[in-house]
A protein has these predicted regions:
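Positions that flank functional sites
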Residues: 41, 118, 141
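Conserved glycine-rich acetyl-CoA-binding loop
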Residues: 83-97, 105-106, 110, 116-124, ...
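Acetyl-CoA-dependent GNAT
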Residues: 3-4, 10-89, 93-102, 106, ...
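Conserved catalytic-core motifs of GNAT/GCN5-like acyltransferases
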Residues: 114, 127, 132-150
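Residues at secondary-structure transition points
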Residues: 13, 90, 94, 117, ...
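Short Asp/Glu-rich motifs
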Residues: 45-46, 122, 145-146
Length: 169
């Protein structure tokens, strides 16, 4: 693996050719990973899927990805994942930066996400990026059979709200 400053990295849109690699990463990172159907449904629904590819030992590999859903003046980040071998190289921040650019191009005012209450590292990353904790969803994530975990809801203001029509501001 290369040092972060010398990584050859590029963003790519979703391609079914990377499907198995994405599933392998998803299953290696999460105790309750997305299913193949979750990814297929996201593609079919037209959600934004961004792959982050790296050059590693002469081969291009998936290092991370995200899935986001566009709404009215907002984007909801549904899944962001960096492969364990590539964590700690700033790739999650790179994915978030690209998502902010994409969201602003669509005139989104807000970026929303949920994160497991126990995932304090991710919460710190999001806070450092500028996200604010705005609430929680009780019993949102599955745990062991019959148990659930709360989600922390976070949001990032991407642009100032538009003045209401007829406003003199």
């Amino acid at each position: 693996m290369s040092a972060a400053s010398t990584l050859a990295v590029r963003h790519a849109p979703w391609s079914d050719g990377w499907f198995d690699d994405v599933l392998t990463i998803e299953q290696s990172v999460y105790s309750h990973p997305w299913t193949p159907g979750n990814f297929r449904d996201s593609v079919a629904a037209g959600y934004h899927l961004d792959l982050l590819l790296v050059q590693d030992q002469g081969q291009e590999r998936v290092a991370g990805y995200l899935v986001a859903m566009e709404g009215v003046e907002e984007v909801h980040l549904l899944n962001i994942t960096v492969a364990p071998a590539w964590q700690g190289h700033g790739l999650g921040t790179r994915l978030l930066n690209a998502l902010c650019v994409w969201s602003r191009q669509r005139q989104a005012q807000w970026l929303w996400l949920e994160v497991r209450a126990s995932n304090t590292h991710a919460q710190q990353v999001y806070q450092h990026f500028g996200f604010k904790r705005v609430g929680e969803r009780k019993h949102y994530y599955p745990l062991a059979p019959g148990r659930r975990e709360d989600a922390v809801v976070m949001s990032l203001l991407l642009r100032a709200p538009r003045p209401a029509s007829g406003s003199t501001a």
